Each structure stands twice: as C-alpha cells, then as structure tokens.
Amino acid sequence: MIKQPALVQEQYACVYAWLALLFFREVDDEGLIQLQSAEIADWLALLKRQPALAASVALLEQKIAALSLRQDAQLELAADFCGLFLMTDKKSALPYASQYPQQEPGMIKHLLLEAGMEVNDDFKEPADHLAIYLELLSHLHFSLGESFQQRRMNKLRQKTLSSLLEWLPEFTNNCLKHDPYGFYAALSQLLLAIVRFDDGKEDLSIVAAE
C-alpha cells in the first residue's frame, strides 16, 4: 500500500481557519455555494487520503450532498446553527470551553497571550469560543513555517490541542445528539478527528511544505 504524504503546516492552517468560520457564524447563501463547490470537494479529497480522517470526511461529503435535497437549505442550516450553538437549553451544543467542566477556566487567554495574540474588539462572542481555538491553531501552523520560532510555536500548538481535547469530545457528542439533519454533527466529527490526528504528531516543525 502506498503511504500518503502527511498534511503540511499550511494545509492544517487553512483547514482550521475554514472550520473556525463554519462554527462561528451561520452559512449564508454564498457560503452554501462554496460548500458545494469543486474547491471544497478537492480539499475534502485531500483530507480523505489520510486513513485517520477518511471516515469523517466521507460522512461530511454525504451531508453536503444531502443539502441539495433540502428545500431552503440555507435557511434550514441557519436554524440548525441557531438551535445548536446559540440556545442555552439541554438540546444544544454550546461552543464555549467554559460550558464544559473539564476545561481549566481562562485557559484560552493564557494560550493567546503566549502566542502574542488577542481577541479582536469586533468579536462579540466570549473569548473561549471554539472558533478562537481554531484560529489560534491556524496561526500556530502558519508560524511553524518560520524557522526562528518553530520550537516555541510547536510547544504551544501541543498545549492548545491538549486543552481543546479536554472538552471537544463532549461538544462533538452533543452535536451528534442534537443535530437532526447531521451537517454540524458530521462537521464536529471531522474536527475532532483532525485535532486528534494533529495531536498525534509529536513535532510538526519538521514537516514543511515544498
């Protein structure tokens, strides 16, 4: 069997940034078109080459294909997003680290400080939103391409992944339980698979894009 090449830093960075956007705000009409585009299909095909991600990618591909069968797909996705991530009842999957007892309070602020980052004033959500963790991981993977800070950024990447994995499995399980159509459930499963896959790489500072 031919071994597939590992994902490189820039690919991780782009995938994390894409996922951050999808978990931060509702999919609008333009976003729906992009989800169903050849560009996203190519990205998913790239991820699918990794055996650890193949099943999660295949499930998300099925859910994206199913969107074409839903009347008013954009409005229904928006309703799914609102019900899962903006409500506070027991049938939601709130994307905030502080909602999960496993997470040390204020961890994301320490991680951002170490990375020399801060939350933009225009960001109206709490700083421990899932999207902030993913944007941080995206930034760290891009920074790994700069040789003078590889060691420090890789160590911070590992700390961020470990912190995220304290509560991401429960978040994913909540998405599975409460997403009736399954798009965000599939998206969260792919995210969890990617984070676990990334966490399994001890030192990504040696993996460089050609």
UniProtKB/Swiss-Prot annotation:
Keywords: Chaperone, Cytoplasm. Its main location: cytoplasm. One of its GO terms (biological process) is protein complex oligomerization. It holds the Pfam family Nitrate_red_del. It is found in: Cytoplasm. GO terms for cellular component: cytoplasm. Involved in the biogenesis of TorA. Acts on TorA before the insertion of the molybdenum cofactor and, as a result, probably favors a conformation of the apoenzyme that is competent for acquiring the cofactor. Belongs to the TorD/DmsD family. TorD subfamily. This is Chaperone protein TorD. It comes from Salmonella paratyphi B (strain ATCC BAA-1250 / SPB7).
